[in-house]
Amino acid sequence: MKKERLFTNRQLLTLLWPLIIEQMLEILVGMADTVMVSSVGEAAISGVSLVDMINQLIITLFGALATGGAVVTSQHLGAKRPEDAAKSAGQLVGLGAILGVGVAAFCLITRTAQLRLFFGTITDEVMQACLTYFTITALSFPFLALYNAGAAIFRSTGNSAVSMKVSVIVNGINFCGNALCVFVLKMGVAGVAVPTLISRAVGACIILALAARQDYQLRITPQSVTRFEGRTVKSILYIGIPSAFENSLFQLGRVLVVSMISLFGTVHISANAVANNLDAIGCIVGNAMGLAMITVIGRCIGAQDFEQTNYYTKKLLLWDYIAQGAVNVVVLLFLNQILSMYTLTPETRALAWTLVMIHNGMSIFLWPASFVLPNALRAANDVRFTMVVATASMLVWRMGLSWVLCVQMGMGAVGVWYAMVVDWICRIICFVARFVSGAWKKNAVKKAA
């Protein structure tokens, strides 16, 4: 008798397409931000791009906590324990609130010191842009943490359409606000920061209100959010802390290599910023697939069904290779037309073209196995392995080799991006070997027991 699958193709697509749209909106609005602020000048675009590297480090902290909550909640649902799933959802929101407020306070107090530490060689004009943008966006961190927690709760139930609809509202406010503040009110760098703060606050309020509805299966209540239970919190942090350490160190590594790039001046900083925007387009499907992998594999692990864990991991990886490859090919084919949307000097544009070619060309073959596959391991509680591999690879290749190529050999931004590709290859070798060996199963059994 043929075994019944936990997810049909229709259910997988229902989970995936809202995630893809949500990622697409986030990336496209981010691109629009960069295009708008580029009209203010290259000092402005440099300031925003540098602070966004630090902001991305903070965002990964919130994302790691949300991943921990999503894994635990999905596993409870897979094991047919809805009450425990609802409990973990409430605890996730409470932890998110604490983390968001704490991180915001830390960043506001140390913002000048952080910028001097990471980007001490930048001009005064760029530093002023950094300070303005960092101060305003730091105020939005509590709202972002709460939004991430709420979105993770809905994804755990397979209802990613909710977070997508809220994302449409959030990004709509952000885009319209940017246009108003930059072009009409002439607010400069602050014009792309204030709408970010407002939109994140609105998004957090909406998604938490939806999660608190009486008819929602994982309904959060004031009691579930504020009364922490050691066992549930420990389960969330068991996944969240290694993920936070891994992802935050990864982003810190990105900040440090950008500080290397900043040694080569505004042209390299601006080209790197634009290239990061365009690279993100090629990763839209992959990022969505990574989020879906958490939900799907978490359910399989909760049900202790390792055959279906293998089946869905391979299936989602195949889908990602096909879809992400197609998107990257399109970006490369129309790269010159896309770059023409930015206000760049010829030298900056030429360097941005080279960087995008390196990233998007290689990601067709390397990105899914390097970044989507480890989410399957995380959903199976194999978080320590992914943390060790990702951290070691980042330190040795993304940072160490970047220093050699970028600074010692004078290759600038191009050297950093070559080192990034080597980092991807190392990650793939380790993660594929781990998955194929089946060594991850011992952690899945131990935590589910």
Which functions belong to the PLM regions below?
Residues 1-19, 73-140, 182-241, 297-363, ...:
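Short alpha-helical transmembrane segments in multi-pass integral membrane proteins
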Residues 4-35, 39-40, 56-68, 72, ...:
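N-terminal transmembrane alpha-helices
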Residues 14-33, 136, 170, 199-203, ...:
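Transmembrane helical elements of multi-pass membrane transporters/channels
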Residues 23-27, 60, 100, 104, ...:
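Residue-level hotspots within the lipid-embedded alpha helices of multi-pass solute transporters
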Residues 27-46, 115-124, 180-187, 248-281, ...:
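Helix-terminus/linker motif at the lipid-water interface of multi-pass membrane proteins
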Residues 42-53, 130, 134, 193, ...:
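Small-residue hotspots at the loop-to-helix junctions and early N-terminal turns
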Residues 45-105, 144-163, 258, 269-335, ...:
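Small-residue-rich hydrophobic transmembrane alpha-helices
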Residues 66, 136-155, 163-174, 192-207, ...:
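Short runs within selected transmembrane alpha-helices of multi-pass transporters and secretion channels
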